[in-house]
Amino acid sequence: MADRVMCQELATPGSHYRRPKTGVPSTNVVYANGGGSWRAAPRQTQRLPRQTVQQYATGTPATGSAGRHSGRAFATAGATEEQTVEFNGAAVMGLPATPRTTKQARNKSEEAINDLLTRIPDIGKLFDVHSRIGNGTFSTVLLGTLRRESHLPDSLRRKFAIKHHIPTSHPDRIMKELQCMTKMGGKENVVGIHCCMRYDASAAFVMPFMAHDRFQDFYTRMDVPEIRQYMRNLLVALRHVHKFDVIHRDVKPSNFLYNRRRREFLLVDFGLAQHVNPPAARSSGSAAAIAAANNKNNNNNNNNNSKRPRERESKGDVQQIALDAGLGGAVKRMRLHEESNKMPLKPVNDIAPSDAPEQSVDGSNHVQPQLVQQEQQQLQPQQQQQQQQQQQQSQQQQQPQQQSQQQHPQRQPQLAQMDQTASTPSGSKYNTNRNVSAAAANNAKCVCFANPSVCLNCLMKKEVHASRAGTPGYRPPEVLLKYPDQTTAVDVWAAGVIFLSIMSTVYPFFKAPNDFIALAEIVTIFGDQAIRKTALALDRMITLSQRSRPLNLRKLCLRFRYRSVFSDAKLLKSYESVDGSCEVCRNCDQYFFNCLCEDSDYLTEPLDAYECFPPSAYDLLDRLLEINPHKRITAEEALKHPFFTAAEEAEQTEQDQLANGTPRKMRRQRYQSHRTVAASQEQVKQQVALDLQQAAINKL
């Protein structure tokens, strides 16, 4: 029996979903093709048999030829066409028409619909599923409408995005995404959820549908006011998510939907979302961990006398352990002796105190039988003789060492090291002391650099567990460096990368196949010193093959934005020398007149004529892309940046001027100003007369 949770809003016919209000009121001015006013084409009506609907919705945008043409279809959203679509024998009237799709795309859409209806049969009882509108690694998004609203016209029918999770998705992943949308969704540009349906191992989310533009279709056509509105709404959504101490972890243009005509925004896809502890809880937790570690060290020091260091056990001790455990065979003694010579790869737990019941080699606790006790009493004289022989042998070995120390005092440090290695079992050169704390092992200096083997210090270190989830190209340096204590600054870096792509008109800006190349790309832009300092602050070590100076973000954005101008052959010819060569900067690998370095010594081509962004935009970009996550600006602080606040004040002033700019109000203002000036002149005359009278009185 399917577990089904339905909202009353869906169950009630005729009720309609109201789109969530954005953080910023929408404006009436809508830009098409970079500017101007929006004009819709005249409405046309025709009937197209068996046409698959391709619309934008929450999730990954459609790929292939369907994805390329769908942007054009939405660009003329006013010219919607009515059609008849047939799915599984059911005809749906009045859906918006789109260009024809290929046979392969149609087959994939039908396969996705059949898979959804097969795995969750109750979906077909409530919804008419029309087409696949997006797919990802862990889910597929389909377009659906309510069956009970099939009699309504297209303008009154509600559309839903049905996200079908693949059966192999982990339940925790589905639960986290459901919790995020339930707690945070439906406001502040964050996607909400209507209901969740489950059948056996399959689950589906029913979410509001929002038609949107593809990022690659509009990011080069946005002007400064539209860029400001886009980034403001993105930061509004991130601020709302971060209030719940949640990291989205997958902020990118395809997950931040934007309807350019209606100026609507929506942050979707919380499949990688992660809850983090607030800063106060993290600091208290770390303090508690330090206190617990200190208590453990104190207990270890107090129980040193009661513990039995395994690395100092001799052959006689190994035999004694075997006898205590009831294992007196020669085979067991040989096996124990071989195990005592093995080197541990990782630190193990401390040995239990002596007051605990004695354990056998296999770890079992039991009482010694009487026969074993009798054998122990018989073997005690033999054991004493063996111990005396071992002491005599050790004294004989120490005598020549003392003589050599007197003859060669310079070799004393080397002999001290030899004594330390001799104290380990079987004379091994590795330190096998298992009571070394984990902190000491992690802080130990590595000695295996540029060697063909791995040192024990590296083997004794704890494994680093750091989340690396996210889309390549949008992951910050702390994720690439595997820093375990990651915060919501991860999403702020991704927002900065989106801002950089818009300002430079380069999408995607970072594109690396692995983490090492991704770090190299960041080093190329921000320099090696910033990465080294950040790695040191995060207690990470990074090795770079060469040094690199940082680049100027303003030069970078304008050079890319007007790449056709600065890469013109005529411009290059004007800077060439007599022999036809042109000097190239060694750091940024650009011609000297196009040098992008922050501290460039070259006389570069002026950029003031091509400037299109205010200085506050570059300052905000620099703070969003701060390498050190502890110094990076938050979403709430970014919304208070002058790039947004100065524009809001200017807009408010313009609105006040427009409100007070009617002819009647202007005439009233001129009349009031004239009366004020006339009154002020009369007051001046009266004051002058009073001053003259006062002067005459003083003379008398």
Swiss-Prot record:
Binding-site positions, ATP: 133-141, 163
Induction cue: Post-transcriptionally regulated by 20-hydroxyecdysone (20E)-induced let-7 miRNA.
EC number(s) given by UniProt: 2.7.11.1
UniProt name for this protein: non-specific serine/threonine protein kinase Cdc7
Family the UniProt entry places it in: Belongs to the protein kinase superfamily. Ser/Thr protein kinase family.
Phenotype seen when the gene is deleted: Lethal.
Described function: Catalytic component of the Dbf4-dependent kinase (DDK) complex. Phosphorylates components of the pre-replication complex, including Mcm2 and, to a lesser extent, Mcm4. Phosphorylates histones, including H3 and H2B. Required for DNA replication and mitotic proliferation, including during the endoreplication and amplification stages of DNA replication in egg chamber follicle cells of the ovary.
